[in-house]
């Protein structure tokens, strides 16, 4: 549990540092700032060049939005956290995916869901260098609108993909506890089907992010933002309905299902009769369940709640001061990509063994030889003890 404790400590440090950065950022504009959280307004109609091609229109932002885009919160704090997540998340999820696909022979439903969860985390983390570069260059996107769409689509898509696979994993764990005699192959086939359905669902729900324009040029700051500034009519209309639907359908319902599964799991474990050795395992399982459930809500709940609040404020009051906090919460949600591999390590004994063998550069053939040797040694000890006991019985007669 030490690794999970370190992850919690990292999350706490993130929150404290982010709170200080948010306070400095919000207070920068002064008391007269209207604070319309990254709403872009078209300055003038785009001029026409001599060739008849319109020049890219420029958008203006208010003082609060300018302070967020130029402040240390987005240009220093966020890239530092994303660098940490990238450095830890890329190798750990890559190794986890390799263990699940190439080192684990028995593809149980839990292994299938964890492999898909590792894949979702990996697909999210591999795009972080672009996001880090964007923030380090003062929130100036230089890679084109198409690549910005891909970055945003993968970022949000894989976040909600992780939520759904964690929900499937929690429901599957509860089902194994209440129905341990089920057919494993049938369960594995169901898990594969559910996984494919989740990937298809995530692709469909992220299509709007690939269709709409994500880059906005701001002449006053001489930067081109990626998703951080959008036209007011888009924020009030399409994006409000879109993200509200995502928050309810792809976060709220799975969160309630996950919480229910874990609560029922804890009740079932506590009510079951066990010996002293099994009691220790049960307590460890309950602690792990509480840790995973807390991680689930701490990583994903703040960003989804603040996102809904942000769009509600924009729609009702045409202003919002919570976008800076939302950026912090969204950054906090990426810590899940660092924590998940350690959760695999504590949840699955098979993953622990295979990961340890992989780190020690032991091939599958070497591991088999070690297992055969260990089994033969145990058998020889039992045989020798049986023969010695038989000899002692004969001599006594």
UniProtKB/Swiss-Prot annotation:
Residues bearing glycans: 23, 222
GO MF term list: G protein-coupled receptor activity; G-protein alpha-subunit binding; G-protein beta-subunit binding; protease binding; proteinase-activated receptor activity; thrombin-activated receptor activity
Site feature: Cleavage: 36-37
Pfam families cross-referenced by the UniProt entry: 7tm_1
Residues excised as propeptide: 26-36
Stretches assigned to the Extracellular side: 37-71, 138-149, 212-235, 318-323
This protein's record includes keyword Translocase: no
Membrane-crossing residue ranges in chain numbering: 72-101, 109-137, 150-177, 184-211, 236-269, 278-317, 324-347
GO cellular component terms, semicolon-separated: early endosome; plasma membrane; pseudopodium
Residues in the signal sequence: 1-25
Subcellular location: Cell membrane
Residue ranges annotated as Cytoplasmic topological domain: 102-108, 178-183, 270-277, 348-397
Keywords: Cell membrane, Disulfide bond, G-protein coupled receptor, Glycoprotein, Immunity, Inflammatory response, Innate immunity, Lipoprotein, Membrane, Palmitate, Phosphoprotein, Receptor, Signal, Transducer, Transmembrane, Transmembrane helix, Ubl conjugation
Annotated membrane topology: Multi-pass membrane protein
Lipidation (S-palmitoyl cysteine): 361
UniProt miscellaneous comment: Synthetic PAR agonist peptides (APs) that mimic the first six amino acids of the newly formed N-terminus activate the native, uncleaved receptor nonenzymatically by binding directly to the corresponding second extracellular loop to mediate signaling.
Quaternary assembly: Interacts with TLR4, COPS5 and TMED2. Interacts with GNAQ, GNA11, GNA12, GNA13 and GNA14.
Record's protein name: Proteinase-activated receptor 2
GN (gene name): F2rl1
């Amino acid at each position: 549990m030490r690794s999970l404790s370190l992850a919690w400590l990292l999350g706490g440090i993130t929150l404290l540092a982010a709170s200080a950065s948010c306070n400095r950022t919000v207070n920068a504009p002064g008391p007269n700032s209207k604070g319309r959280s990254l709403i872009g307004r078209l300055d003038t109609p785009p001029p026409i060049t001599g060739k008849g091609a319109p020049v890219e229109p420029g958008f203006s932002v208010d003082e609060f939005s300018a302070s967020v885009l130029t402040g240390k919160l987005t240009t220093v704090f966020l890239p530092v956290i994303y660098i940490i997540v990238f450095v830890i998340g890329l190798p750990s999820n890559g190794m986890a995916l390799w263990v699940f696909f190439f080192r684990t022979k028995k593809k149980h439903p839990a292994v299938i869901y964890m492999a898909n969860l590792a894949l979702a985390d990996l697909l999210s983390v591999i795009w972080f260098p672009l996001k880090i570069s964007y923030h380090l260059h003062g929130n100036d996107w230089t890679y084109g609108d198409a690549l910005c769409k891909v970055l945003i689509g993968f970022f949000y898509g894989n976040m909600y993909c992780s939520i759904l696979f964690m929900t499937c994993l929690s429901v599957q764990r509860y089902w194994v506890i209440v129905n341990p005699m089920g057919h494993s192959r049938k369960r594995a086939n169901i898990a594969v089907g559910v996984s494919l359905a989740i990937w298809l669902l995530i692709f469909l729900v992220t299509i709007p992010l690939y269709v709409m324009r994500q880059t906005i040029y701001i002449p006053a700051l001489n930067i081109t933002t990626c998703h951080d500034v959008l036209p007011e009519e888009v924020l009030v209309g399409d994006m409000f309905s879109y993200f509200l639907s995502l928050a309810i359908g792809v976060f709220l319902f799975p969160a309630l299902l996950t919480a229910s599964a874990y609560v029922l799991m804890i009740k079932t474990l506590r009510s079951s009769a066990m010996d002293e050795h099994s009691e220790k395992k049960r307590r460890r399982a309950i602690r792990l369940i509480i840790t995973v459930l807390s991680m689930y809500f701490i990583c994903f709940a703040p960003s989804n709640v603040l996102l809904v609040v942000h769009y509600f404020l924009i729609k009702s009051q045409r202003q919002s001061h919570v976008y800076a906090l939302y950026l912090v919460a969204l950054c906090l949600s990426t810590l899940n990509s660092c924590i998940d591999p350690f959760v695999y390590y504590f949840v699955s004994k098979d993953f622990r063994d295979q990961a340890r063998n992989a780190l020690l550069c032991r091939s599958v053939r070497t591991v088999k030889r070690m297992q055969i040797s260990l089994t033969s040694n145990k058998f020889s000890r039992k045989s020798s003890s049986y023969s010695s006991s038989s000899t002692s019985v004969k001599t006594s007669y």
